[in-house]
Curated annotation (Swiss-Prot):
Protein name (Swiss-Prot/TrEMBL): Histidinol-phosphate aminotransferase
Keyword line: Amino-acid biosynthesis, Aminotransferase, Histidine biosynthesis, Pyridoxal phosphate, Transferase
Gene: hisC
Organism: Bacillus cytotoxicus (strain DSM 22905 / CIP 110041 / 391-98 / NVH 391-98)
CDD domains in alphabetical order: AAT_like
Lineage of source species: Bacteria, Bacillati, Bacillota, Bacilli, Bacillales
Enzyme Commission code(s) on record: 2.6.1.9
C-alpha cells in the first residue's frame, strides 16, 4: 500500500510520559506530572455539576454546528457566531486549516522552535516549511517577514510561544501585519492567552475587523482545564471560516465537550483564580532561578523554560526517577533546557528543591575538575 512520501520523514506525535507508565517503570507510588501544560487546579465545579446532571441521548450524534457553544463563545468574545470554527482541540483546527490551504508549491513560515504541529501538517500536505530561529527566545518577525513570498499561505505566530513562554509585543505585531501580503494568512495561536498578563501583549480580536488575513486560535484545554474533552476554536473573517467549514469532519466535537465548554466559559471567577495562582507559581520558579543563577525565559503561560547547566534529557530522566515528569527541551531542539508546567504550590516547591540539588551537584563537580 503506497502512502504519501512525505509521511516517511515524519514521526507520530509522542506526548510526555503518562503517570501510570512512570509508576510501572520506576516502581513509584506518587507521581507529579508537570509536562503537558495542563491546569493543576482542574476545571470549574460547574463543569463537574453539569457532567453529573448530563442526561443526553448518547445514541444520537452531537450538534455538528455546536450552536449553543457557538453563541456562548461569540458573546464572550464579542464576535459574530459565523466567525467561529470549532475543532476537537486545536490540533484538529490546525489540521483543518493546513488541509484547506496547503499543497505542493505553497509554503508556510514559522518560528523555530515552536509548536510542532504547524510543521507536521504542512509537510503532510506537501508544502515547504520555512523556519526562522527565535531571537532571544522571541519570534523574529522581521526575519519571518523576509521569508514571506507570493506562495506563502500561512504565517504561524504562537503567542505566547510554546516551548519558551515568550510573547510578541503589540507594536511589533501591528507593524508585521501592515507588511504581510494580504494573500498570506497570519494565524495567532493563543492557546495560552488567558495566562498572558503583560501590558503590551496584543489584543488580537479587535484587529480582525481591519485584517481579513488574520486568524486567532484559542482552546479550552489549558486555563479552562478541559484537556480531556478536546475542544478548541478559530476566530477569523467570516467568509474564510465558511470555506474552512468544508474541511471540518462532521460531528467533530462531542455533545459532552460542547456542554462542558459552554459551562466553563461562564465561570470566569474560577478562571481568574487559576491565573492568579499560576502567577504565584511562576514567581516561585523566578525566585529559584535568581537565587541559583539559572537561565530562564520570563513566561506569559502556565509553564517555564529554564536551563540549569545540564542536558535537558539528563534532568528529565533524573527528575522522573524521583517521580516528577517534566518535558526535556531536546524534542524542540533546545538540548540544554527543560520545560516545567506550573503545578500546585507544594509541587513547585518539591521540584524546585530537586532542581536546587542538581545545580549544587553540578557546581561542585565543575569545581572539582577546575
Amino acid at each position: 500500500m503506497k502512502v504519501k512520501e512525505q509521511l516517511f520523514s515524519l514521526n507520530a506525535y509522542v506526548p510526555g510520559k503518562n503517570i501510570e507508565e512512570v509508576k510501572r517503570e520506576y516502581g513509584l507510588s506518587k507521581i507529579v506530572k508537570l509536562a503537558s501544560n495542563e491546569n493543576p487546579f482542574g476545571c470549574s465545579k460547574r463543569v463537574k455539576e453539569a457532567l453529573a446532571l448530563l442526561n443526553e441521548q448518547y445514541a444520537l450524534y452531537p450538534d455538528g454546528a455546536a450552536f449553543e457553544l457557538r453563541q456562548k463563545v461569540a458573546n464572550h468574545l464579542k464576535v459574530q457566531p459565523e466567525q467561529l470554527l470549532f475543532g476537537s482541540g486545536l490540533d484538529e483546527v490546525i489540521q483543518m486549516i493546513s488541509r484547506a490551504l496547503l499543497h505542493k508549491g505553497t509554503n508556510v513560515v514559522m518560528a523555530r522552535p515552536t509548536f510542532s504541529q504547524y510543521r507536521h501538517h504542512a509537510i503532510i500536505e506537501g508544502a515547504e516549511v520555512r523556519e526562522v530561529p527565535l531571537k532571544d527566545g522571541i519570534h523574529d518577525l522581521d526575519a519571518m517577514l523576509e521569508q514571506v513570498d507570493y506562495n506563502t499561505r500561512i504565517v504561524w505566530v504562537c503567542n505566547p510561544n510554546n516551548p519558551t513562554g515568550t510573547y510578541v509585543e503589540k507594536q511589533k505585531l501591528l507593524s508585521f501585519l501592515e507588511n504581510v501580503p494580504k494573500s498570506s494568512l497570519v494565524i495567532m495561536d493563543e492557546a495560552y492567552y488567558e495566562y498572558a498578563g503583560a501590558e503590551d501583549y496584543p489584543q488580537t480580536l479587535p484587529l480582525l475587523e481591519k485584517y481579513e488575513n488574520l486568524m486567532v486560535l484559542r482552546t479550552f484545554s489549558k486555563a479552562y482545564g478541559l484537556a480531556a474533552f478536546r475542544i478548541g476554536y478559530a476566530v477569523g473573517y467570516a467568509e474564510l471560516i465558511k470555506k474552512l467549514e468544508v474541511a471540518r469532519l462532521p460531528f467533530n466535537t462531542s455533545t459532552v465537550a460542547q456542554v462542558v465548554a459552554s459551562v466553563a466559559i461562564d465561570d470566569q471567577s474560577f478562571l481568574q483564580e487559576c491565573v492568579k495562582k499560576n502567577a504565584e507559581g511562576l514567581e516561585q520558579y523566578y525566585q529559584f532561578c535568581k537565587e541559583y543563577d539559572v537561565f530562564y525565559y520570563p513566561s506569559q503561560t502556565n509553564f517555564i523554560f529554564l536551563k540549569i547547566g545540564l542536558p535537558g534529557n539528563e534532568v528529565f530522566e533524573r527528575l522522573m526517577k524521583k517521580g516528577y515528569i517534566v518535558r526535556s527541551g531536546a524534542p524542540f531542539g533546545l538540548l540544554d533546557g527543560i520545560r516545567i508546567t506550573v503545578g500546585l504550590k507544594e509541587e513547585n516547591a518539591e521540584i524546585i528543591a530537586l532542581l536546587a540539588n542538581l545545580v549544587k551537584e553540578h557546581v561542585k563537580k565543575e569545581e572539582t575538575y577546575s
